[in-house]
Each structure stands twice: as structure tokens, then as C-alpha cells.
Amino acid sequence: MRAEILAVGTELLLGQIANTNAQYISSKLPEAGVGVYYHSVVGDNPDRLEDCLKLALKRCDIVITTGGLGPTQDDLTKETISRVCGKKLVLHQESLNDIRNYFSSLGRQMTPNNEKQAYMPEGCIILKNTNGTAPGCIIETGGKIVVMLPGPPAEMKPMFLDYVIPYFKNKGAYSIESVILRVFGIGESAMETKIMDLIDAQTNPTIATYAKEGEVSIRVTASVLKGESADSILIPVVNEIKRRTGDNLYSDKDKTLDAVVAELLTKNNITIGTAESCTGGLISEKLTDIPGISQVFMGGAVTYSNEAKVEYLGVKEQTIKAHGAVSRETASEMAEGIRKRLKTDIGISVTGIAGPGGGTAEKPVGLVYIGLSSESGTVTKELRLSGNRKKIRTITALNVFDLIRRHILKLKIDL
């Protein structure tokens, strides 16, 4: 089944809000055996919406709309779709009662225009909205399926999961299963080269690579008859990709690198402390975003100035004078200092130049040193990164997590 997602709202066209609904729906539909072929966005204009809808119905089996179901005059999605599909709008009393109860629960008076939301296309499947006022619906017409969902993500997501996904799972003869492998330390073009023969030979399963913030994800997707397992066609391909990616593969369950590291730390009861300069606490933030990390994360220090490095971490003044704050030597003493101060199994350090200023010919913007100190010794790694300040900080954090991962798993560390 081929689907098009049609987002309705002038605010989307103006760039005032991001179209996160389409991304979310696209990520979930494959598990119900539905492939997304197109994304479209149209403003709150009934004529242009009608044009987009007719095109979508011509080229796809399924059209899923988001937005335009509210009580105001510019909320015209339901009216436009009903007209195109030849359906009358009729009052659905249960939906009207739900809307009244919603306002009552908030202690507010329902204005008359809200009644508009309870008028539904005749013969449609009603999708109850337990998080707002506008119900959604599904129309089956002429061998096509049109799904209307509210625009606010807090209303759309539960409605989509509770009603739409089960609906399509019951409809389709096929289901789609995917495995997502995540790799760090190999660029997208190099990764694609490693598996090009697999990509060229793909039929079922299919293989796709995509890059994001210094890492590469590889999606392996299989289509099987509903009720059958995809393991027999997925596992051989996944295992071959794992073999070719080697130590650079850090997850076969679509987990982030920081989540994988947090799991390794807690599973092995390895305590950790961080000393950060140019990343400004980013590594600590990413760790503390993960539930349960408190049992191993003892604390972090943002030692931005030379004085803080000396006074809090015990970095020698002579080290900074001789080698500079951005150096292997300083990174080494920072990692050792935080480990000793917090009495942890691992001490992590970062010192570098994130830009846009501060660089020299000898030490340019993007030069970063990271360090890891443990009972077995201290290692440091030099990074030469490019991009803006945010990107340099983000890629640095990923390199730190990869360093921790490799240390715990006793993998090779390229210094």
C-alpha cells in the first residue's frame, strides 16, 4: 500500500513550525505494511487543498492528512475532503458529547463554533480524540483510503497509534520489518562503498544508508506476508553488514551512542566523571538525560578557564604554559584530575577550540583533545573537526562516547 502524507496549515508553509507530524507518521507506517511515497504541504486554502488531495488520490492508495480539523473558519480539511469524496457531513452526537465534556473538564464554556468539529463525513470511521476536541476519521472510497488527523502532535500521535496503525495492520496482506544499524567513525560514502555490492543486489530486503551528525545509520527493511517472520531474510544481510563494519558498529537496535555508553557503564557498574571545556557540559547533559545514570555518573565540571583547570582539576600551571590549554598534555591531566577528585573508575576530559574565533595557524578552530583516565592509565586523542561551533561540540561529544565505549569493550582506540 502506497501512502502520501498531506500536512495542512499555512503556518507550515511560512516556516513558523516544523512538520514533525509527517516525520513521525513516516517512521511508524512501515510496521503496518504501508510505504510512504510522498510528503506534501498545503496552506489553509480549500482550492489548493482540493488540488493536492486529487493528485494524492491519483498516485497513492492512502492519503493521510494532518491539521485543519479545528473549530475556526480556516479549518477546512474535513469539508474539502468530504466534498471531493462525495460525502455529506452529518452530526455525530457522541463526538459532540465528547467535545462538551472536554470543555466541562477544564471548567470552560464551549463556544458554538466548536460544534463544527462534531460534523463527520457520512459512513466514516470515527477516531476518538482523548487529548483535545477535534476527532479524526477514516474514509474508504473508490478503493482509496483517506485518514484525517488533528494537527497538534499531542493529539495526533496517540490517535495515530491507537487507531490508525491497528487499522492498517488489519487491512494489509504484508508487514514490513526493519533493523537499523548505527555506525560511528566511518563516513556515509565510505560506508556505502563497503556495502555497495549488497545495495546493488538488493531486492528484499532493501538497504539504505543515511548520515546524521558524524554517524551513519543503515536501515535494512524486509517485506513479508502478515504473520510470517522476516528473520530468515533479514538476519543474513544484517550479519554481513555487521561483519563489514566491525568495531565501528555500536548498535543494531537503533540506539544512540550516548544511550549505548550509559548502558555499558551501568551494566558493568563503572563510575564516571567529566571535565569539560569547549563542550560546556554537553557530555554531562547527554548522560543525565538517560534514566538510571545516577548510579554511575558521579559528577561533571565545566573548567573553561585555565585557572579552573589548575584549581579544580590539579592541572599543572607549567603544563599549560609549556603546551597550552588545548593540548594532549592538558587533556591528560584534566582526565586524571577529575577521576581523582570524584574517585571514579573513569575520568573524561575535553579541551579544544570550537570557534568561530580563537584559532591560530598552529592550533586552528576545530582542534580538540579528548582524554580518558582509568586505573590502567590515561589515553588522549586528537580531533581535527570542521563546521560551526554547535557541530564541533556535537561531534566532540560523539567521539568522547565512542572512546568510552571502546575502552569498556577493550576495542582498538586510534589515537
Swiss-Prot record:
Matching Gene3D superfamilies: 3.30.70.2860, CinA-like (3.90.950.20), MoaB/Mog-like domain (3.40.980.10)
Query: Known CDD domains for this protein?
Result: cinA (cd00885)
Write the signal peptide boundaries.
none
Write out the similarity annotation.
Belongs to the CinA family.
Instruction: Supply the name of the protein.
Output: Putative competence-damage inducible protein
